[in-house]
């Protein structure tokens, strides 16, 4: 029997998909800009 693949961890979630990580790269900033343009309430994890 295999275990469930999603093991929630807030720290890992923020490190991999967080706002500061998005701001770090040009591509990440583009993601945030796209989400702002779309009117997302939450921009990142």
Swiss-Prot record:
Q: Which GO terms describe its molecular function?
A: structural constituent of ribosome
Q: Does the entry feature the keyword Ribosomal protein, yes or no? A: yes
Q: Which Pfam families match?
A: Ribosomal_L34 (PF00468)
Q: Name one GO cellular component term.
A: ribosome
InterPro entries noted in UniProt: Ribosomal_bL34, Ribosomal_bL34_CS
Q: Does the keyword S-adenosyl-L-methionine apply?
A: no
- Entry keyword set: Ribonucleoprotein, Ribosomal protein
List the GO biological process terms.
translation
Q: Which domain of life is it from?
A: Bacteria
In the record, the note on similarity to other proteins reads:
Belongs to the bacterial ribosomal protein bL34 family.
Return the protein name.
Large ribosomal subunit protein bL34
User: Which organism is this entry from?
Assistant: Paenarthrobacter aurescens (strain TC1)
């Amino acid at each position: 029997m295999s275990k469930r693949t999603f093991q929630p961890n807030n720290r890992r979630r923020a490190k991999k998909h967080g706002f500061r990580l998005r701001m770090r790269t040009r591509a990440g900033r583009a993601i945030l800009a796209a989400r702002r343009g779309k009117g997302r309430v939450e921009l990142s994890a």
